[in-house]
């Protein structure tokens, strides 16, 4: 862009608008024969735009003129004289800054990419946190997901939950505030109670899954294997959410790879999707739902998240078979305990609920409140949430 224009062509900038071609020719003519004087004018007003091009017959004369006249005053203004560049010095000059500028955007992009690309995983991995809930979730899910799940449920609990919350915010803007806060609450809960009370944490997780869809998964997988399993079971729905909420196919994929990867390993993935989303999900809900109350059967069960899900999970788990069974055992234990708790809650045993449920409950309520996102689901969820809560 900045190649020199034809030899002997000088750019004269910073001209007084009163300076005309004749004046330029008079001033520069003394350095040698001038072939052309081109004063740039405004097309509409025909006034000088303050710069001109003077072409000398001899490049040597042009160099002399540039050396002598650069910085000199002409008609009261210090002028700039230098070899003209191809596009026209100004545009050329302007072009230079752009590179830095463009560099900046890339940077921005990079950041953005990191954020959104977080989904891609590794890259954002470092930055998920920075990037934002999303990337984090995704990243975790995608990059870290599978391993981390196994690796550091606890850490994850710590970490993912936040992620979860972040996502929940964005994901469910509806749950946004509620969801997010609750989620975070859940998270906190996670930090401690979750482990203590898998159920609640899970529930939170569930909530979040519902809310976040993703992070929950992460948290699941990370948090309790069972939960990850659950997640998986869930996963189908969350997946749906994710599609819906995130619309990130990548995250979806990540999940699949992540939480789902478990599924794949189990070979459940397919089953799951079929069962959970299809029947077992619902069926389990129904079976549970019946015990619980019809609402779950509706399919909103998710709102139950906690109880129905647990149950469902357990059932689906069983249905899923061995791997699941192994999980099941742990899961079921968690679940059973969770279930009991849940049952209690439903029954109206405030203590258990309060015990560590409260956050979850809040999260539920919040999620249910924020549920708008889910639409019907949301509604049922809220109902359910209300029920379970009260």
Swiss-Prot record:
RRM domain ranges (all copies): 8-86
Subcellular localization(s) per the UniProt record: Nucleus
One GO term (biological process): regulation of alternative mRNA splicing, via spliceosome
Modified residues (N-acetylvaline): 2
Domain of life per record: Eukaryota
Omega-N-methylarginine found at: 125, 144, 164, 172
Residues the record lists as N6-acetyllysine modifications: 30
Statement: the UniProt record of this protein carries the keyword Secreted: no
Domain comment quoted from the record: The RRM domain is necessary for RNA-binding, but not for splice site selection, indicating that its splicing activity does not require direct binding to RNA.
Quaternary organization: Homomultimer. Found in the supraspliceosome complex Identified in the spliceosome C complex. Interacts with KHDRBS3. Forms a complex with ILF2, ILF3, YLPM1, KHDRBS1, NCOA5 and PPP1CA. Interacts with SAFB/SAFB1. Interacts with ERAP1; the interaction is RNA-independent. Interacts with CLK2, KHDRBS2, SAFB, TRA2B and YTHDC1. Interacts with PPIA/CYPA.
Name this protein carries in UniProt: RNA-binding motif protein, X chromosome
Origin species: Rattus norvegicus
The gene coding this protein: Rbmx
């Amino acid at each position: 862009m900045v190649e020199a224009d034809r030899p002997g062509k000088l750019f004269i900038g910073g001209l007084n608008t009163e300076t005309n071609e004749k004046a330029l020719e008079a001033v520069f003519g003394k350095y040698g024969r001038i072939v052309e004087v081109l004063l740039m004018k405004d097309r509409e007003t025909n006034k000088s735009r303050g710069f001109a091009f003077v072409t000398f017959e001899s490049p040597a004369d042009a160099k002399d003129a540039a050396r002598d006249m650069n910085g000199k005053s002409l008609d009261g203004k210090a002028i700039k004289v230098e070899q003209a560049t191809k596009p026209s010095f100004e545009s050329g000059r302007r072009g230079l800054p752009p590179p830095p500028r463009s560099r900046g955007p890339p940077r921005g992009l990079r950041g953005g990419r990191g954020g959104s690309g977080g989904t891609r995983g590794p890259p954002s991995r470092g930055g998920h946190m920075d990037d934002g809930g999303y990337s984090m979730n995704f990243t975790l899910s995608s990059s870290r997901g599978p391993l981390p799940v196994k690796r550091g449920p606890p850490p994850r609990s710590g970490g993912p939950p936040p992620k979860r919350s972040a996502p929940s915010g964005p994901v469910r803007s509806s749950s946004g505030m509620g969801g997010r806060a609750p989620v975070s609450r859940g998270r906190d809960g996670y930090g401690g109670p979750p482990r203590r009370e898998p159920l609640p944490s899970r529930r939170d997780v569930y909530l979040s899954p519902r809310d976040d869809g993703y992070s929950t998964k992460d948290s699941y997988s990370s948090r309790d294997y069972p939960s990850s399993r659950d997640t998986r079971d869930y996963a189908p729905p969350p997946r749906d959410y994710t599609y819906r909420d995130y619309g990130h196919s990548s995250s979806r994929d990540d999940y699949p790879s992540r939480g789902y990867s478990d599924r794949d390993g189990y070979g459940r993935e397919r089953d799951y999707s079929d069962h959970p989303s299809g029947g077992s999900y619902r069926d389990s809900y129904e079976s549970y739902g019946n015990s619980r109350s019809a609402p779950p059967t509706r399919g909103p069960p998710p709102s139950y998240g906690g109880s129905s899900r647990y149950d469902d999970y357990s059932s689906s788990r069983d249905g899923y078979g061995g791997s699941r069974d192994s999980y099941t055992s742990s899961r079921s234990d968690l679940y059973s305990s969770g279930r009991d708790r849940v049952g209690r809650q439903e029954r109206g045993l405030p203590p258990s609920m309060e015990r560590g449920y409260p956050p979850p409950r809040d999260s539920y309520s919040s999620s249910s409140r924020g549920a708008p996102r889910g639409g019907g689901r949301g509604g049922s969820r809220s109902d359910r949430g209300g029920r379970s809560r009260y």
